[in-house]
């Protein structure tokens, strides 16, 4: 997502050269940094009071307004500058998941930003996603109220719901249906002639029958993810000019700890009785939603027409608190101007 710059046009460049006239100023700056450092206070507010600051979220706009208030209190000239808009907004709440079985466990997962939450607490059985038309017809009746385990490994992005993704699905379905016919022939030959032909592998595409599974009543989709789990956002949807509040995703897109995914996948294959339960509070906001840069400046006394630009991006992915990316930039940047 577009990086948002916190641009601070500062006064004349501060140096630490050992010039006698500058000794007092340098000493004062060092003393403030050692004895009155406010960086952790800035980080505490940004990461714990506001948390993840996704573009299009209330948390981002609240954080931007707070930065304006802080800069004004330090005597800076500051303003909010409109940077752009997103078609819809997104606010993330808490999320929970459980495996309900004799070996039940709390599930470790995340969902990409700008994807759907659940409709309250939702519980259901699990099925493997179909790879061809025959498999889809076989499980169609079990999709209603089911959590679907999909193929592939999570890299942060959600299921591709775009028109280009649908075009890829059409081609892969055709190829897999041909592979299915060849495999059926191989099975027949193995049975009739005692041959030991191996089955041909099917091509994978996460959510290959996505629309069909949604229409059949699936509760949501679960994909295996390496740990730490990476969750980004629905970039294709946000860049689509046709995106609006009436054509948003309706089912959760869960990225589950690969070790737990493997356990659940094996339980499905073994046809063991169990259920999965999720409560995911992802909420959309009517758009378009504007987002802003925070621009603050201190006019230099000696070189008023020269600038030192100090910046960091205030936005952050919202599955965490944005302490590293980019709290470690915003905290020092903001405090630099207090010392100036």
What are these regions (language model features)?
Residues 1-22:
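Bacterial Sec-dependent N-terminal signal peptides
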Residues 19-77, 233, 298-302:
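N-terminal hydrophobic or amphipathic helices/low-complexity stretches enriched
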Residues 23-25, 108, 114-138, 239-322, ...:
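Soluble metallo-hydrolase cores and metallopeptidase-like ectodomains found primarily
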Residues 25, 39-42, 59-67, 135, ...:
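Stable alpha-helical elements in mature extracytoplasmic
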Residues 27-33, 50-58, 126-129, 194-203, ...:
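Second-shell loop/turn segments in exported
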Residues 44, 48, 52-186:
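Noncatalytic luminal/extracellular "stalk/propeptide" segments of secretory-pathway proteins
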Residues 185, 193, 201, 206, ...:
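Loop-rich non-cytosolic ectodomains and luminal regions
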Residues 336-340:
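Conserved small/polar residues in nucleotide/adenosyl-binding loops
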């Amino acid at each position: 997502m577009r990086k948002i710059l916190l641009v601070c046009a500062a006064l004349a460049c501060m140096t630490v050269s050992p010039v006698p006239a500058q000794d007092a100023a340098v000493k004062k700056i060092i003393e403030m940094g050692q004895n009155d450092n406010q960086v952790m206070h800035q980080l505490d507010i940004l990461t714990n009071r506001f948390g993840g600051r996704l573009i299009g979220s209330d948390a981002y706009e609240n954080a931007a307004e707070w930065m304006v208030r802080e800069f004004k209190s330090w005597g800076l000239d500051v303003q909010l500058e409109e940077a752009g808009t997103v078609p819809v907004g997104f606010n993330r709440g808490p999320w929970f998941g459980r495996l309900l079985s004799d070996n039940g466990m709390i599930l470790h997962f995340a969902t990409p930003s700008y994807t759907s939450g659940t409709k309250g607490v939702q519980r259901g059985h699990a099925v493997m996603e179909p790879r061809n038309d025959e498999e889809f017809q076989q499980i169609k009746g079990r999709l209603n109220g089911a959590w679907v385990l999909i193929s592939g490994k999570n890299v942060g992005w959600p299921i591709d719901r775009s028109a280009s993704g649908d075009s890829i699905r059409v081609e892969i379905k055709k190829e897999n249906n041909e592979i299915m016919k060849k495999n059926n022939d191989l099975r027949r030959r193995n049975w009739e002639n005692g041959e030991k032909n191996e089955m041909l592998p099917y091509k994978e595409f996460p959510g290959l029958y996505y629309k069909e599974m949604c229409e059949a009543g699936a509760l949501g989709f679960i994909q295996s993810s390496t740990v730490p789990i990476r969750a980004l956002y629905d970039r294709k949807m946000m860049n689509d000019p046709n995106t609006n509040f009436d054509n948003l995703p309706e089912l959760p897109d869960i990225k589950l700890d690969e070790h737990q995914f493997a356990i659940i996948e094996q339980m499905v294959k073994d046809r063991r009785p169990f259920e999965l339960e999720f409560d995911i509070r992802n909420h959309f906001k009517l758009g378009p939603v504007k987002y802003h840069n925070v621009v603050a400046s201190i006019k230099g006394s000696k070189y008023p027409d020269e600038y030192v630009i100090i910046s960091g991006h205030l936005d952050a992915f919202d599955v965490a608190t944005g302490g590293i990316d980019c709290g470690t930039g915003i905290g020092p940047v903001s405090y630099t101007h207090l010392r100036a």
